[in-house]
C-alpha cells in the first residue's frame, strides 16, 4: 500500500507589456482566437505530466536532449517476508520531493524545471511551490544552469514557460500576495502553443534562454 501525504495534489502542478515571438513559436495576442489545430489536453486523454513526458521521449528519440522526470522519494514503513529469499513492501509513503520535477542536459547546458497545473483562470497559487524548490532553482541559476517552470492553466488550455528568475523574484517580493497574476506570467514568460508532436515544444524557448546565458 502506497500513501500520498495529505494535501498533495495529483495534478501538477496587470496587462502584458510585451509579446515575445521565437522561431517556431507562435505567441498569441490578447483576444486572438485560438487556432483550430490546437487540441485540448483533456480531449487527447493525457494529463499535463504525461504531455511533458511524451515531449521528453520525443526529444530523446531525436537526439535533441536528455531530460527525465525525477523519481519521487518513497519512505518504506513495513516489509513482509513471505519467503526467505523474497521481500514484499506492504506499506510505504511518498515523501516530499526535495528539488524539482525534471532535469537533464540540452546542448551542454544543465536544464532543471518544475511543472505545475491549476484550474484557476487569472492567477497561479504560490502554495504550489515550496521554499526548498525556490532555493534549489536559485542554486541552479548560480551555477549558470537553465531553470524554469512550466505552468498549465487547464481552464484556459494555456501553457507558459516562466524563467525561474521571475518566480524567485516574485516569491520573495510578493508583498502579501498568495498567487502569481496571469498578467505577470504573460509579461515575463512565454506562451507555448501545443503541437501534436512534440506535445509541448518547450525546447524552442529553452534554446533562446541558452543564447542569453
UniProtKB/Swiss-Prot annotation:
- Reaction(s) catalyzed by this protein? Endonucleolytic cleavage at a junction such as a reciprocal single-stranded crossover between two homologous DNA duplexes (Holliday junction)
Concerning Pfam families, the annotation shows:
RecU
* Cofactor annotation: Mg(2+)
What cellular component terms from Gene Ontology apply here?
A: cytoplasm
* Highest taxon of source: Bacteria
UniProt remark on cofactor binding: Binds 1 Mg(2+) ion per subunit.
| Any GO MF annotation of the entry | nucleic acid binding
Q: Where along the chain is Mg(2+) bound?
A: 99, 101, 114, 133
Report the record's Gene Ontology biological process terms: chromosome segregation; DNA recombination; DNA repair
InterPro entries associated with the record: Resolv_RecU, Restrct_endonuc-II-like, tRNA_endonuc-like_dom_sf
Where, subcellularly, is it found?
Answer: Cytoplasm
Q: Could you say which residues are annotated as the site Transition state stabilizer?
A: 116
Keywords in alphabetical order: Cytoplasm, DNA damage, DNA recombination, DNA repair, Endonuclease, Hydrolase, Magnesium, Metal-binding, Nuclease
Q: What class of enzyme is it?
A: hydrolase
What are its E.C. numbers? 3.1.21.10
SUPFAM superfamilies linked to this entry: Restriction endonuclease-like
Give the family this protein belongs to, as stated in its UniProt record: Belongs to the RecU family.
> What does this gene product do?
Endonuclease that resolves Holliday junction intermediates in genetic recombination. Cleaves mobile four-strand junctions by introducing symmetrical nicks in paired strands. Promotes annealing of linear ssDNA with homologous dsDNA. Required for DNA repair, homologous recombination and chromosome segregation.
The protein's name in its UniProt record: Holliday junction resolvase RecU
Species this protein is from: Lactococcus lactis subsp. cremoris (strain MG1363)
Encoded by which gene? recU
